[in-house]
Amino acid sequence: MVAAKTIKTLVWKSELPDNIKEELYNKLIEYNKKYKLKKAEVEAIIEDAVNEYRKALVEPGEPIGTVAAQSIGEPSTQMTLNTFHYAGVAEINVTLGLPRIIEIVDARKNPSTPVMTVFLDEEHRYDLEKAREVARRIEGTTIENLAREMSIDILNFEFIVEIDPERLEKSGLDMERILKKLSGSFKSAEFEAEGYSLIVRPKKVTKLSDLRKLAEKVKKHRLKGLSGVGKTIIRKEGDEYVIYTEGSNFKQVLKVPGVDPTRTRTNNIWEIADVLGIEAARNAIIEEIVNTMREQGLEVDIRHIMLVADMMTLDGVIRPIGRHGIVGEKSSVLARAAFEITTQHLFEAAERGEVDPLNGVVENVLIGQPVPVGTGIVKLTMNLPLRPQRE
C-alpha cells in the first residue's frame, strides 16, 4: 500500500490542471484504501489520466469558434419558432426553441416569459398544504386577480369591485386586510366594504378621467406576494412538491420561509448574475441552452455551448454575441468592418490610428493571406543546401 504523501507527490508532478489533480488524488486515496495499490500501479493510473487529458485537448490551430458556431447553428435550424407550454405545466407558457436560444445569446435583460422553479425545504416539500402556504407567500395577488367583476358608477362617482369569495379564500386574505392595505397606500381615496363588494370613492376628484386613473391604480395594486411574480403552480415531482411561477424575482424568493435557496432557479440569467455572481450566470447559460436543445430532441456537444458561455462571461459581466457585444468589440479593425457598419468602423479606426495585427480569420481572408488556422498557424522556413562556391 502506497503512502498518501507519495500519491500526492506523484499526482502533483503530472501536467494535469489543478482541479483534475485534486479529483485524481481523492480517487487514488479511495482506491488505495480499497485495493492496496503498489507504486507502479499508481504511476500507471496517473499516466493513463495524463494520456486521456492530452487526447481531450484541442489540436493547435483548430478553429474552435467556427466549429462551435456550426455545431450550435445547424441543429438550431430544425428548432421550433413558437412559445410552448413549460415541461408539462400547461398553465405556464415559456419561450422555447429558437426564440429562447436567441434570447440567451443576445443577453436580453428581460426574457419574454420569465419563470422560476422554486424547490422547498425539508419541512415543506412533502406536504401539499405546506407547499400551498409557501406558494401563497410568493404569488403576486392584486385586486384584479381577486375580482369577479369591476365597474365604474358614473352617477355616484365610485369604483366598485365585486370580490370572488373562492379566490379570496385561496389567497389567504380577507376584506378587512384588503381595506387596511388599500387605505394605507391610497391617501386620496376612501374605501368601504359591503359584504364582498369593495367601494372606492375619490376624496377630491371631479373628473371622470381621474376616477378611471385611480381605478387602474387600485386594480393593479399588489396586496401580497413578490413583485414581478404572477400566478404559481404546484406540481408533484417524485416524492416532493415543486412550485413554478409566472414571472421572476430571484433575490426575494430566496428569502421566503420554506424555500430551498440551494436548488431554486430562474430562467433570467441577469438576475442570477446579480444575486449569485458571474460563475453561476455562466452555468445558467450552459444549462438553459442545453435544456432548450434537448426539449427539441437535439444533442449538441456541451463543449461548444461552454465556449459560448465562456466568451459571454469572460469580462465578469454578461455580454451579448453581436454588434453590441463580442463581435463589436473585436480587436481587429477589419473584422469589425467586415461584420457591419463598415465605413463607420474604418473612419473611427483611422481617426484613432489603430493598427490591425491580422491575427484572425476574417481579416486575413479580406487581404488574401493564408488564414492562421490549422496548418496556416505554422510558420516554416527551409534551410536549402548551398552549393559550394566555385573558385
UniProtKB/Swiss-Prot annotation:
GO terms for biological process: DNA-templated transcription. Its EC number is 2.7.7.6. One of its GO terms (cellular component) is DNA-directed RNA polymerase complex. It is found in: Cytoplasm. It comes from the Archaea. SUPFAM superfamilies: beta and beta-prime subunits of DNA dependent RNA-polymerase. Keywords: Cytoplasm, DNA-binding, DNA-directed RNA polymerase, Nucleotidyltransferase, Transcription, Transferase. Gene3D superfamilies: 1.10.150.390. GO terms for molecular function: DNA binding; DNA-directed RNA polymerase activity. It is an enzyme of class 2 (transferase). It catalyses: RNA(n) + a ribonucleoside 5'-triphosphate = RNA(n+1) + diphosphate. Its main location: cytoplasm. The keyword Ribonucleoprotein does not apply. Part of the RNA polymerase complex. Belongs to the RNA polymerase beta' chain family. DNA-dependent RNA polymerase (RNAP) catalyzes the transcription of DNA into RNA using the four ribonucleoside triphosphates as substrates. Forms part of the jaw domain. This is DNA-directed RNA polymerase subunit Rpo1C.
